[in-house]
């Protein structure tokens, strides 16, 4: 399997999470077509991937509501019809409904979102291992 990892990062936590996810998938024998910010994406990286992983950070105040940062950038990604996708978000306090909203945005691109995980910024190592393990377990093996 091949994966493309796309992210939006402000402080570097989401970038680090994307890099750790890619490294964990490589340990499972997956190929990685890219690990890159969404704004620097090359279309070929999505075309070559079997699974597109989209990650961002949680934006907003705990009392007002949280949302995935950069939803506009996600909405402008190329169509992903026929692609499997997984999502992740990094957070400090509480992700709220960020992951659900991220799943919805990626689904609108035509991807079949098979899951996601909210990753606490102080537990990136263990949470990214869990993310990769869940992804490997839930992606159908190609014939």
What are these model-derived regions, one by one?
Residues 1-4:
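Extreme N-terminal starter segment of soluble prokaryotic enzymes
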Residues 13-16, 24-35, 45-143:
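FMN-binding flavodoxin-like domain, especially the glycine-rich phosphate-binding loop
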Residues 37-41:
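Conserved SAM/SAH-binding loop
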Residues 6-8, 88:
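Short hydrophobic segments within beta-strands
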